Amino acid sequence: MSTCIEGTPSTTRTPTRAWVALAVLALPVLLIAIDNTVLAFALPLIAEDFRPSATTQLWIVDVYSLVLAALLVAMGSLGDRLGRRRLLLIGGAGFAVVSALAAFAPSAELLVGARALLGVFGAMLMPSTLSLIRNIFTDASARRLAIAIWASCFTAGSALGPIVGGALLEHFHWGAVFLVAVPILLPLLVLGPRLVPESRDPNPGPFDPVSIVLSFTTMLPIVWAVKTAAHDGLSAAAAAAFAVGIVSGALFVRRQNRSATPMLDIGLFKVMPFTSSILANFLSIIGLIGFIFFISQHLQLVLGLSPLTAGLVTLPGAVVSMIAGLAVVKAAKRFAPDTLMVTGLVFVAVGFLMILLFRHNLTVAAIIASFVVLELGVGVSQTVSNDTIVASVPAAKSGAASAVSETAYELGAVVGTATLGTIFTAFYRSNVDVPAGLTPEQTGAAAESIGGAAAVAADLPAATATQLLDSARAAFDSGIAPTAVIAAMLVLAAAAVVGVAFRR
């Protein structure tokens, strides 16, 4: 029989103050989503200003997610102990200040340092918002609606990021994309202390710095190893880092199991709705983030759209996702969570398979249609899974539970880009036909990626450039079909996990 996650019966009206508090809590979610996408558009201008090495340029992009993923579990547990609102406000203030520093960074190295600090403060924001919602909204129906609104803000931010970034970069210095954080976070810092009630674990136990270090040395090496292997191939350094992460993880689990007051209660993973929802999110995000990354390149490098126009192509899907997330709140009163999650995940898989169907004529209209179906499924499945995650654990542990959920999201994004990227690149390299007469450096760059081919083509005679670009675009599109199939299989695997686990 399906498991339903229950909350306080819907007999009392949620006070207006709670909904105003939700509006305040939505601000950092909107910011993080925007921040995840705008840097990609600013990177060419940053490279033009600082002329960083390829390694430094990768660190500008990657260091934020490395630090964020490494600290999420520790920050979630810290919020349970020190107070979730307090941690949220510290994170908001720090994120705003460091964003301003990043905007005016005088060198690439200082920008890397600022991005690392943004990862520290960003790790304080996301778990705090979701766990505070869990404690503010005790009524099950109101909580589902609140989480749907919370999730829709993330979707809206992801859609607005390319649009905001494109608009700012057309008129201002690249630092403007970092300054976006300041006006978004200012209302949080002013209104948060007045409108958002404090909550914490009433019996948190002693502070455990050893567990914090172990959680950090688990996540950081693993994420770094996956990213490094994706960029440079498997190496001894990546393998060693991965091994360090696995050993640290084993020591972390052992310490938590032996502690009377663990930083992360490993027993949470015995709750099947919690664990299956986490795993489903992880698998679906691998497919979603990895595949969206390549579709955005198709829009810009194959179809020739500007970053701003490419961002607008994804907007209809984002709107549908928000509507679906809000609509599923009513459906949750009639259908079990696993039924809704599986239905949503199937829609996501169908969206991927539509890309496969249109692969020989992947126009803007075809991409919009596919993304509308895909994002409809995302809106349903993510809203229900996030509600299930926070509702299936005690309120006192909601910070740690939210942190685990966010960690799964970050890991899924990293693994998705890395694994699907490797597969996609392999298809590109095996199908691209580089014209004769190019220098070894030009041949290597053109054979590496479609972006490299476009850069090389800019310095070639018109006929040779056209020949190279036609071949590069065809080779790029050859990877779309297998990537779509793999993404669909991952999402269907997530649906199977939910369908089986909820019936145990």
Swiss-Prot record:
SUPFAM superfamilies in the record: MFS general substrate transporter
Induction: Expression is repressed by LfrR. Induced by ethidium bromide, acriflavine or rhodamine 123, via inhibition of LfrR binding.
MF-aspect GO terms: transmembrane transporter activity
TM helices/strands, residue ranges: 19-39, 58-78, 87-107, 110-130, 145-165, 172-192, 206-226, 233-253, 275-295, 309-329, 338-358, 361-381, 408-428, 480-500
The keyword Plastid is assigned to this record: no
GO biological process: response to antibiotic
Domain of life where this protein originates: Bacteria
One Pfam short name: MFS_1
GO cellular component: plasma membrane
Topology class, membrane: Multi-pass membrane protein
KO phenotype (gene knockout): Disruption or deletion of the gene decreases resistance to ethidium bromide and acriflavine and results in a small decrease in minimal inhibitory concentrations (MICs) for ciprofloxacin, doxorubicin, rhodamine, norfloxacin, isoniazid, tetracycline, ethambutol and rifampicin. Increased accumulation of intracellular ethidium bromide in the presence and absence of a proton motive force.
Keyword list, A-Z: Antibiotic resistance, Cell inner membrane, Cell membrane, Membrane, Transmembrane, Transmembrane helix, Transport
Subcellular location field: Cell inner membrane
Activity modulation: Inhibited by the protonophore carbonyl cyanide m-chorophenylhydrazone (CCCP). Ethidium bromide efflux is inhibited by chlorpromazine, thioridazine and verapamil.
Physiological role: Energy-dependent efflux pump that contributes to drug resistance. Catalyzes the efflux of norfloxacin and several related fluoroquinolones (FQ). Contributes significantly to the intrinsic MICs for ethidium bromide and acriflavine. Overexpression confers low-level resistance to hydrophilic FQ such as ciprofloxacin, ofloxacin and levofloxacin, and to ethidium bromide, acridine, acriflavine, rhodamine 123 and some quaternary ammonium compounds. May contribute to resistance to certain beta-lactams. Probably uses the proton motive force to export drugs.
Family from the record: Belongs to the major facilitator superfamily.
Stated name of the protein: Multidrug efflux pump LfrA
Organism: Mycolicibacterium smegmatis (strain ATCC 700084 / mc(2)155)
Name of the gene: lfrA
